Amino acid sequence: MAVYTDITDQELEAFLEGYDLGAPLAFKGIAEGVENSNFLLETEKGRYILTVYERRVKAEDLPYFLNMLTWLADRGYPSARPIPTRSGATLSSLRGKPAAIVEFLPGLSVRKPTAAHCREAGEGLAWLHLAGEGYPGRRANDLGQAAWSPLFSKHRKAAEDLKPGLSATIDNDLAQLSLMWPRNLPTGTIHADYFPDNVFFQSNGKFAAAIDFYFACDDAYAYDVAVTLNAWCFEADGSFNITAAKALLNGYERRRPLSPIEKEALPILARGAAMRFFLTRLADWGSTPAGALVRPKDPLEYERKLAVHREGLVLFA
Amino acid sequence: MAVYTDITDQELEAFLEGYDLGAPLAFKGIAEGVENSNFLLETEKGRYILTVYERRVKAEDLPYFLNMLTWLADRGYPSARPIPTRSGATLSSLRGKPAAIVEFLPGLSVRKPTAAHCREAGEGLAWLHLAGEGYPGRRANDLGQAAWSPLFSKHRKAAEDLKPGLSATIDNDLAQLSLMWPRNLPTGTIHADYFPDNVFFQSNGKFAAAIDFYFACDDAYAYDVAVTLNAWCFEADGSFNITAAKALLNGYERRRPLSPIEKEALPILARGAAMRFFLTRLADWGSTPAGALVRPKDPLEYERKLAVHREGLVLFA
C-alpha cells in the first residue's frame, strides 16, 4: 500500500483547475504501487488515477515515461493514457512534487498466476514490445548488467548478514554474468518490471492492461521476457514451473516470435534478471530502518531464483 | 489509510459467487477508515465498497450497523446501502473475517471545513436523526458517560506521562460530568463519530453522504450534535470557531429544531464529548507499540478541547 502524500480537498481543487476535467466527484487514496502515491479520482469527465511521484523515480525521467504512455495509447496498447493539462503538459506538480493524471484502467491483477494467465501475460508483453517500436524517447537501463557489480559492492555486508558465504557466491555469479552476458540481441523499449501486480486481466482471464512503467528503459526485449519468467513462473516453494514458462513464451511468440539467438540467451538473461532483483531487494533490505512503514521485499526469494538459474534452464527442448 | 487484510483475486471471485453482482472488473484497496479494510470493487453490476471488519468492531454488532444502513437507505438517506448475498444476508465473511459489500457513494470529504460546510454537515446530521427514527435495532453507547471513569482508571498513568498533573484534572472533570450529565434528553439512533472524514460533499459544497456508522448507538441526539461541534468547529490552533458552530447548529435546525433543554445541555454535552474522544485516544496512545503501522491520534488535541469546554461555551445568546 502506498499513500505517502496527503492531498486536501482544497489542494485537489486547485490542482484540477489546470485540467479540463470538470469538478471532482470522488477521490480516494489507493493501495497500488510501492514507489508513488496513487489516488482514484472521479470527475465530471470520467475516472482517472492521480499519481504523485515520490522517491526513486527521477523527475527528469518523467517525460520519458509519460510520453511513452501517450505513445503506447496512441497505438492502441492498453496502458493508461496521460491526461494533458490545459496547456498541453502531461507532467504537472502537486504539493511541490511531480504529479500526473492518467486514465483509469479496469482489470484485476492475479496473485497466483495460472499457466493460462502466463500465456496472456506473455502475449501482452510482446504486444508492448511491438507497440513501443519507434518510440523516440531514450533511457539507459540504470539497473542493467553493468550496474550490478558496483551495486553489490555497496551491500556485500548485508548479503553476508542474510546468509554467511553468500557474498562469494554472488561475486562468482557476477563474474560469470559479465563473461557470458549477451550483447547482440534485438533491443528496444522494455517494461523491465512486468510483475503480476503490474498486469491487469479481464474477468474472463484475458489480458487487459499493463501499468507502472516507471522502470521502463532501453534494453534487450528478451531480457524483459526473462524478468517476466522470473516474476510469473516460480512456485511459492521456489521451484520453477516449466509449464507456466512455456505458456508464457508461447503467448509471447503469438505476437513476436523470438529469434534463435534470443532463445539461446534466455537462460543467462533469466539468471541476470534474478541477480538484478536480488541486488535491489538487498539494497532496500539494508537501507530500511527497523519499524519503517514499508516492509522491504525478501532478497532471499530472488537468491533462491538465482540458485535455480545457476543450474541452467532448459526452456526449448 | 487502512488495508489490513490482503484479498487475492481467487478469494474475491469465490466471495463474489455469493452475490448477484456479476464478475469483478476492478478491485483496489483504499485508504479510508482506520478500523477496517476497505476495497473499491467494480463489477458488471456497478461500483461498491467491500469492507472486511477488523479490530474494535464487534461481530455481534454488525447486524445492527448493516440493518441500520439498509433502514436509512430505504428512507432516502444518503448512506451506503448494503448489498445482500444471494441468500439475502447483508453480513458475509471473507478470510474468516466478517465482511460486507455496500454501495459506492460519490463525494469528497473536506479537510478544513468552512462555515458553509458546517451548515451542510449540520443539516445532514439532523436528516440522519430523523431518518433513523423508528429503527428497531438497539445498541447501548458503550463509550457513553457511564464508561468514562472506568476507562480512565486503566489509563491514568498514560495521562500523567503525557502531561504531569493531568490525571487530577481529568478526575475533576469526570466528577463534574457525572454530576451535571443530562439524562432527560430526546434520544434515538445517533452516528456518534460524525467527523469530517465521515461526511462527503458534492463538488458544489452541498452535503452528499455520511459513511462509517460503526460507532452508531442509542443516545441523546444533542450528544451527537456535541460530538460534531467538537469535530468540525475547532481551529488548528485549538480555538473554538463560534461562527462555524452557529452555522452547524443553524443547518441542523433547518431539519430538526433543538428543544430548549437540548440547547441548554449542549455545553456540558460538548465537554463530555471531548472527554470521550480524549479517553479513547489516550487508550490507543498507551496501547500502540512503538513502530506500529498505524499512528495513534494525539490525545492532547482533545485535552485542549476539554480545556475550552471547561470554561463553558455560549452557543445561544
UniProtKB/Swiss-Prot annotation, chains A, B:
Pathway in which this enzyme or protein is active: Amino-acid biosynthesis; L-threonine biosynthesis; L-threonine from L-aspartate: step 4/5
Name of one Pfam family that matches: APH
InterPro entries xref list: Aminoglycoside_PTrfase (IPR002575), Homoserine_kinase_II (IPR005280), Kinase-like_dom_sf (IPR011009), Pseudomonas-type_ThrB (IPR050249)
Swiss-Prot/TrEMBL catalytic activity: L-homoserine + ATP = O-phospho-L-homoserine + ADP + H(+)
An example Gene Ontology molecular-function term: ATP binding
Any one Gene Ontology BP term: threonine biosynthetic process
Listed EC numbers: 2.7.1.39
NCBIfam families noted in UniProt: PRK05231.1 (NF003558), thrB_alt (TIGR00938)
PANTHER family membership: AMINOGLYCOSIDE PHOSPHOTRANSFERASE DOMAIN-CONTAINING PROTEIN (PTHR21064:SF6), AMINOGLYCOSIDE PHOSPHOTRANSFERASE DOMAIN-CONTAINING PROTEIN-RELATED (PTHR21064)
Protein name: Homoserine kinase
Species this chain originates from: Caulobacter vibrioides (strain NA1000 / CB15N)
Lineage: Bacteria, Pseudomonadati, Pseudomonadota, Alphaproteobacteria, Caulobacterales
